[in-house]
């Protein structure tokens, strides 16, 4: 079924992990941060271009730079309190 690889030393283990990681081929032109998917790069680059527009939670007043972060906050934090 599956072959099990035994890696004896730390250097070889780190090398194996590095090779198994997906390549980050998409690079932000503003800060050089790397991404594996073009969509993630596009969302990230918006944080550099956009003015300081903020989205606030109506329940607790916390501010967010991105609307999707506010949406996540509402789902996981604020509504349950």
Curated annotation (Swiss-Prot):
GO MF annotations, alphabetized: DNA binding; zinc ion binding
Domain of life: Eukaryota
Localization (cell): Nucleus
Keywords associated with the record: Developmental protein, DNA-binding, Metal-binding, Nucleus, Pair-rule protein, Repeat, Transcription, Transcription regulation, Zinc, Zinc-finger
SUPFAM superfamilies: beta-beta-alpha zinc fingers
A Pfam family: zf-C2H2
GO biological process, one term: periodic partitioning by pair rule gene
Zinc finger (C2H2-type): 26-48, 55-75
One GO CC term on file: nucleus
InterPro entries xref list: C2H2-ZF_Transcription_Reg, Znf_C2H2_sf, Znf_C2H2_type
Stated role: Putative transcription factor. May function redundantly with odd and sob in leg joint formation during the larval stages, acting downstream of Notch activation.
Stated name of the protein: Protein drumstick
Gene of this entry: drm
């Amino acid at each position: 079924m599956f072959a099990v690889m035994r890696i004896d030393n730390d250097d070889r283990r780190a090398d194996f992990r590095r090779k198994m990681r997906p390549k980050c081929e998409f690079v932000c032109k503003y800060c050089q941060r790397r991404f594996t998917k073009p969509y993630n790069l596009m969302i990230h680059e918006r944080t550099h271009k956009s003015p300081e527009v903020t989205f606030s939670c109506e329940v607790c007043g916390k501010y967010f730079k991105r609307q999707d972060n506010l949406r996540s906050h509402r789902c996981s934090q604020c509504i349950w309190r």
